[in-house]
């Protein structure tokens, strides 16, 4: 899964941070439908997980509302969706288990999260984490290829898998009584994966076709690929999750097995169970299925990656393509994540993104779409859920006849205004309420709850960090928002990408036809 989301723009406009493989399975074949979003923007895809311009706010808050601990105002009556707060325990082999009781329906969601993503790949092997995600469906000694997926379908369940820069996860949602079966399958493929060239090489072709379809033939995705590479000069977040084409085509069985043996182990995983169960029911199942799997001693206690130097100058990227119908610009700033930020900074960036770019009352939308109007869309976004520094993004699509320079002048003016002057009290309260309310309205998805606990925990946050998020949002002051804009939205910290129509190529192609 490549996921990060951008408001007002199609999925293909999202920076490639995570590959989501929507898996369609039949008894004879498996087809992977990859989507290329990335973290900060609005999406309307499976699981209902990206409904917000500020996805980090949603992901943390969705978990919070599931526990019933969020209170205040009109949200009070809607927060009691689970019968108990999440429970966490750790097996002797290092497997962390999180149980999220949800008694509304007799179904459960099992998600296993491995603390490894594309940023953990060896240089020259880009796309390996995602490639292995595909191969994890190729069977084990105990269960031949297709049996796991066929079992999920037979019991009326569904499944999915995704790879991001920081993690890889596998998911099943099934009737409650099938949890033990799902757990047995999942534990089995943690150690028993069998890979043969007759399965590996065709699957590599599937991934290459994904790249061709979703990136090579998609101008929006190509631009995002280039922006990310320019933003991250040294950090592996600059590599696309799906990989570079010339490196994907060289990946083989030995690469996949080495990666699997290195990273797929209980002490590098988090098992999240959400649904009509509690810890007392889940623990014996986990111990029976996962307890005997040995830990991998070579896995470090903390992931250490090359970090970015202090940005020294703004950068620009221009992509011209004859298929472009709507020119657009997007600017990404290098900013701290919830894991790397100083106290209060991440929450202030959450609020700043909501203030600047979420909805028709946001500052950018009003300045560019309503007041002028110079653009057909405008937005801003931030995602805190990242092990290392992440991005704050602004985007706009100019109207015909409007230059990028005109649009950027307005964007820069809005940022300067926010950075120099504390925002109005009524605006601050409005966006805080929006952050809370939007998340509450989206809480009715069990898989969402499991996904965002897993995402937060695999990127260095704790359950307490998740549970205390509403209080941190409520505590954000106007001065903190102003300071965040001033400190982090400096032009030198940014890469601006321009997507334009290549009219010369289009004319040459018309002449040839």
Task: Tell me the role of every PLM-derived stretch.
Residues 59-69:
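Bacterial N-terminal signal peptides
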Residues 73-111, 116-118, 144-177, 214-267, ...:
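Non-catalytic beta-strand/loop surface segments
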Residues 18-21, 59:
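Cysteine-centered motifs
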Residues 139-142, 173-204, 283, 360, ...:
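M16/insulysin-pitrilysin zinc metalloprotease superfamily fold
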Residues 40-50:
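Short, Lys/Arg-enriched N-terminal segments with co-localized hydrophobic residues
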Residues 126-140:
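Active-site SXXK
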Residues 118-124:
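Short pre-active-site segment immediately N-terminal to the catalytic Zn-binding motif
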């Amino acid at each position: 899964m490549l996921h990060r989301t951008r408001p007002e723009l199609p999925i293909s406009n999202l920076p490639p941070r995570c590959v989501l493989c929507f898996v369609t399975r039949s008894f004879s074949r498996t087809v992977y439908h990859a989507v290329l979003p990335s973290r900060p923007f609005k999406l309307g895809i499976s699981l209902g997980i990206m409904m917000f311009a500020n996805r980090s706010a949603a992901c943390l808050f969705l978990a919070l509302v599931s526990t019933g601990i969020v209170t205040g105002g009109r949200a009070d009556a809607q927060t009691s969706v689970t019968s108990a707060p999440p429970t966490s325990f750790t097996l002797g082999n290092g497997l962390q288990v999180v149980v999220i009781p949800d008694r509304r329906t007799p179904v459960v969601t099992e998600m296993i999260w491995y603390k490894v993503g594309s940023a953990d790949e060896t240089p020259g092997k880009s796309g390996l984490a995602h490639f292995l995600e595909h191969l994890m469906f190729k069977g084990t000694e105990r269960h031949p290829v297709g049996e796991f997926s066929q079992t999920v379908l037979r019991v009326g369940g569904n499944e999915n898998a995704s790879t991001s820069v920081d993690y890889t996860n596998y998911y099943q949602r099934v009737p409650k009584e099938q949890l033990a079966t799902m757990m047995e399958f999942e534990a089995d493929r943690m150690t028993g994966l069998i890979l043969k060239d007759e399965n590996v090489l065709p699957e590599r072709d599937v991934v290459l076709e994904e790249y061709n379809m979703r990136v090579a033939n998609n101008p929006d995705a190509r631009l995002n690929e280039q922006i990310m590479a320019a933003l991250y000069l040294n950090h592996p977040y600059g590599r696309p999750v799906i990989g570079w084409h010339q490196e994907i085509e060289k990946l083989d069985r030995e690469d996949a097995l080495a990666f699997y043996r290195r990273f797929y182990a209980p002490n590098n995983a988090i098992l999240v169970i959400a649904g009509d169960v509690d810890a007392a029911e889940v623990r014996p199942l986990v111990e029976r299925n996962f307890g005997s799997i040995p830990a991998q001693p070579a896995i470090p206690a903390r992931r250490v990656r090359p970090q970015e130097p202090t940005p020294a100058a703004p950068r620009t990227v221009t992509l011209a393509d004859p298929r472009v119908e709507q020119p657009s610009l997007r600017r990404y700033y290098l900013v701290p994540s919830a894991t790397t930020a100083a106290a209060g900074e991440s929450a202030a960036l959450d609020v700043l993104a909501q203030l600047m770019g979420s909805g028709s009352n946001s500052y950018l939308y009003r300045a560019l779409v309503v007041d002028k109007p110079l653009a057909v869309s405008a937005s801003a976004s931030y995602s805190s859920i990242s092990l290392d520094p992440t991005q704050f993004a602004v985007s706009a699509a100019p109207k015909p006849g409007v230059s990028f320079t005109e649009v950027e002048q307005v964007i820069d003016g809005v940022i300067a205004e926010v950075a120099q002057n504390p925002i109005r009290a009524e605006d601050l309260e409005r966006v805080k309420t929006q952050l809370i309310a939007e998340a509450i309205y989206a809480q009715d998805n069990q898989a969402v709850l499991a996904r965002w606990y897993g995402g937060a925990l695999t990127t260095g946050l704790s359950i307490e960090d998740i549970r205390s998020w509403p209080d941190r949002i409520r505590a954000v002051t106007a001065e903190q928002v102003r300071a965040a804009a001033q400190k982090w939205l400096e032009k030198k910290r940014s890469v601006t990408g321009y997507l334009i129509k290549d009219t010369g190529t289009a004319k040459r192609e018309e002449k040839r036809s």
